[in-house]
């Protein structure tokens, strides 16, 4: 079983407009509301793929109830209730652009943070892999993911971390290391303080930096150009075919789902990397974020090339 953690979930509200007009009224006909947050995208894709998955995180208020009520019944909902209201994130789709308005979310008390920590320990009993995705809510210290990873490691669970900024830096500088991290080039550049490109030799060099010591898998997203990955001392380049993209939103989360599934099923390197990329591509072919059409899985799987470099 796989446990997905979304500490700062949201209701995602999508407003499609032909044109966004400032300082006046914009009327929207087709409004879409869905449970949002990177970890919730992960759990929905895992569910589509047929994995047994349970979802946790911190939720509160009517928005929190909306999230629970709008997840598929086959996902085991194990959220921790807090006093604050779960946030709303607005996406305005206009003239080929995407403008996002993101609420910060609720402020958690020390008691709520401690409560979730105990809740997390309890949920580990029957899981093999834990995914930790997205931003931390207000009130949680930057090293909170580091704390959860330490607990998971003590219980023999594999962990996949997908976050950025101070939370990621705290993990990299801490003692407890995740099994997998999945930065993109922009996040990698931010971590290293220099611009990174798709140059394989340069990527090889930086991924051997002591900053990443102790992390089994480093999987760097190259967008439409696939993935560059390091597993222990072996490096891989993953070539993916060109596809017609409907929406790339959530594709990174879908890739995390594939990584988690590969770990849970003890798959070899090539199978894990291929599955992860297929699920990311399948999400990009869908209008709905965090959804994959498995009818196209086998065809894409055969078109991906994983090369040791």
Curated annotation (Swiss-Prot):
Signal peptide limits: none
Superkingdom as given in the UniProt entry: Bacteria
Q: Give UniProt keywords alphabetically.
A: ATP-binding, Kinase, Lactose metabolism, Nucleotide-binding, Transferase
Record has Ribosomal protein as a keyword: no
**Which CDD domains does the entry link to?**
FruK_PfkB_like
A Pfam family: PfkB
- Could you state one GO cellular component term attached to this entry? cytosol
Catalytic activity of the protein:
D-tagatofuranose 6-phosphate + ATP = D-tagatofuranose 1,6-bisphosphate + ADP + H(+)
Give the E.C. number(s).
Answer: 2.7.1.144
GO terms for biological process?
Answer: D-tagatose 6-phosphate catabolic process; lactose catabolic process via tagatose-6-phosphate
The similarity annotation says: Belongs to the carbohydrate kinase PfkB family. LacC subfamily.
Q: NCBIfam families this protein is in?
A: 1-PFK, lacC, PRK13508.1
Q: What is this protein called?
A: Tagatose-6-phosphate kinase
Originating organism: Streptococcus pyogenes serotype M5 (strain Manfredo)
**Gene that specifies this protein:** lacC
